[in-house]
Amino acid sequence: MNDSDGMVFVAHWTHTPENCPGRSKEGATMLNEFWARRDLAAKKGVKILSAYVAATEHTYYITVQAKDYQALLEFFEPLAPTQTGAIHPVTTMDEWTKHIDPKRK
């Protein structure tokens, strides 16, 4: 990953079984429309690196790279009314171990 491509974030979204998007036509439509906006997000500098669903936990893990935090928030905005989310800035383990290299200290 190139730093000029932006920071990397892991977005963690969850919901209760009762408000699971898979339980209603409206919820499924919302989730499908959200996911279909990936191309628009890419045009705004939000690159999806990976995305996983833990279906039995009602949880999504979406790793993104973004230059603009506001564009990142706009991408995830459709989830906010029915999901609980957290967006964590992260670095790779390789980058981190270089940073804490005891030979540098």
Residue ranges and their predicted role:
Residues 62:
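Conserved RNP beta-strands of RNA recognition motif
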